[in-house]
Regions:
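Canonical Radical SAM [4Fe-4S] cluster-binding loop centered on the CxxxCxxC motif
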Residues: 3-48
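Conserved, mostly hydrophobic/aromatic
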Residues: 25, 33, 49, 65, ...
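Active-site beta-loop-alpha junctions enriched in small/polar residues
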Residues: 38, 68-70, 98-102, 128-132, ...
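Alpha-helix N-cap and loop-to-helix initiation/capping positions
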Residues: 41-44, 48, 73, 77, ...
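Short microdomains enriched in Cys/His and/or Lys/Arg
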Residues: 45-61
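Conserved SAM/AdoMet-binding glycine-rich loop
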Residues: 56-157
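Conserved C-terminal portion of the radical SAM core fold
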Residues: 65, 122, 145-207, 221-245
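C-terminal accessory regions of radical SAM enzymes
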Residues: 207-271
């Protein structure tokens, strides 16, 4: 059996059935990330996935595929996994997973649409920022324009996706400008939900070394809150989008809908 050391999932999926698809991260180069630094990437054998499903509750209605980037397994393998879920969990109405801009580039619109038809209905995509300089500094492996292109592919394939954004990622004195660039990206992406996280410098990461060397200065609490406020102010929402800052790393807790709660959120951030 494959050894799955660390399992991460969005807090909104805490009551969802978890299905291991991979262990570790196939990229594992983001400067700020400590989640899979000491883990070798491996894909869970299909036989083990099928056994897990056979032992599960056939009345399961929702599944979350675990692993840093399950779509990195490729189209054919993902299609087989979804067909197995449909076989053993016939009442499952939604399969969700994390995804990266890098892995999405491997898929055509037609392939994404086919995965959607087989039950993959929701992706949590770590966009982090719309600032190309920051993306390069943090070694995300993509540009803002590439992120927008992949978001458009998802929309064309009828795939719902949530955008994960990280404030404080640009560093001291750069937060407001970062918010404006990120809002510009989000305005084109049009995700169903925007989930924010606060940059945390974890020991053992490349970012921790950069801080120690004086090559990255962390933003203070007040500046980070200004970044959240600026992000909300610059979001030009054509359709309703959920805005959620309730992840454990966040400095403030906001949850609701834009544009109707924009002023309410801004007032809370100004208190």
């Amino acid at each position: 059996m494959s050894e799955i050391r660390n399992v991460y999932y969005p807090q909104s999926e805490m009551n969802t059935v978890l299905l291991p698809v991979s262990n570790g991260c196939p990229y594992n180069q983001c400067a700020f990330c400590s989640m899979y630094k000491d883990e070798k990437y491996q894909e869970v054998p299909l036989q083990e996935i099928e056994q897990e499903l056979m032992n599960g509750d056939p009345y399961t209605e929702r599944v979350f595929l675990t692993g840093a980037d399950p779509l990195a397994v490729g189209y054919e393998r993902m299609l087989r996994i979804l067909k197995l879920i449909k076989k053993y969990f016939p009442y499952c109405g939604c399969v969700a997973a994390y995804a990266s801009v890098r892995s999405l580039k491997r898929y055509s619109v037609g392939e994404l649409a086919a995965l959607h038809r087989e039950g993959l209905r929701l992706l949590y995509v770590g966009f982090e920022t719309g600032n190309d300089e920051v993306l390069a500094f943090m070694k995300k492996g993509n540009t803002a324009e590439e992120a927008i292109q992949q978001g458009r592919k998802l929309t064309e394939a009828n795939m719902i996706f949530n955008a994960i954004i990280m404030y404080g990622i640009a560093g001291k004195d750069k937060c407001v400008e970062n918010a404006k660039r990120t809002a510009k990206m989000l305005n084109q992406l049009k995700p169903r939900k925007i989930i924010t996280m606060n940059l945390t410098v974890f020991q053992g990461t490349e970012l921790a070394s950069l801080v120690k060397e004086g090559k990255f200065a962390e933003a203070g609490v007040k500046e980070k809150i200004r970044e959240i406020k600026s992000l909300i102010e610059n979001l030009d929402v054509e359709k309703r989008v959920e805005f959620d800052t309730t992840h454990a790393t966040n400095l403030v807790k906001l949850q609701g809908w834009l544009p109707e709660q924009r002023e309410e959120f801004i007032e809370k951030l100004e208190d």
